[in-house]
Amino acid sequence: MTAIQLIVGLGNPGAEYEQTRHNAGAFFVERIAAAQRVNLVPERKFFGLTGRFTHQGQDVRLLIPTTYMNRSGQAVAALAGFYRIPVESILVAHDELDLPPGVAKLKVGGGHGGHNGLRDIIAQLGNQNTFHRLRLGIGHPGDASKVSGFVLGRAPRAEQEKLDASIDFALGVLPDIFAGEWNRAMKNLHSQKA
């Protein structure tokens, strides 16, 4: 299994969206940066906040696009192209309507499932969809017409605590992910629920 060289956290920029459900992926990357004592700095050529740390001799880059969600691929393609990071070495963390709060799941490849950030990443990577995903459950409002307001809204405290717990679970399996032990990482992560 290819080593992960880039971890992307999806979200929308600006104070208006900072604490919204749609920014779950960005929360995950912020937590990694804090744990690794990495300062995320704006990089105009990568359209986002970036940082880097070394894990067992391997550079791992962090990216939070500062484009809007539906343009996330611009940032991912720019950074991955510049550093020649293969699509299979990218992990994208994002909010997932189809999972309840408190649940996180890993996935390799697949479609965008209606997620505009994933849709743009796949398009900007030349229709390659073999990157890894960390799906952070935010739940579903129950009515498709309410999805936009739901993902762009703040979660109630109990829901946010469950999302935070699922991020903790995901951080706990990062050593397995870095070691390429995807089956073990999936088994451990998928058995936990806040």
Curated annotation (Swiss-Prot):
Hydrolyzes ribosome-free peptidyl-tRNAs (with 1 or more amino acids incorporated), which drop off the ribosome during protein synthesis, or as a result of ribosome stalling. Catalyzes the release of premature peptidyl moieties from peptidyl-tRNA molecules trapped in stalled 50S ribosomal subunits, and thus maintains levels of free tRNAs and 50S ribosomes. It catalyses: an N-acyl-L-alpha-aminoacyl-tRNA + H2O = an N-acyl-L-amino acid + a tRNA + H(+). It is found in: Cytoplasm. NCBIfam families: pth (TIGR00447). InterPro entries: Pept_tRNA_hydro, Pept_tRNA_hydro_CS, Pept_tRNA_hydro_sf. Belongs to the PTH family. Its main location: cytoplasm. SUPFAM superfamilies: Peptidyl-tRNA hydrolase-like (SSF53178). Monomer. The active site is at H22 (proton acceptor). The record marks N12 as: Discriminates between blocked and unblocked aminoacyl-tRNA. The record marks D95 as: Stabilizes the basic form of H active site to accept a proton. GO terms for biological process: protein quality control for misfolded or incompletely synthesized proteins; rescue of stalled ribosome. GO terms for molecular function: peptidyl-tRNA hydrolase activity; tRNA binding. Keywords: Cytoplasm, Hydrolase, RNA-binding, tRNA-binding. The gene is pth. This is Peptidyl-tRNA hydrolase. The keyword Heme does not apply. Pfam families: Pept_tRNA_hydro. It comes from Pseudomonas savastanoi pv. phaseolicola (strain 1448A / Race 6).
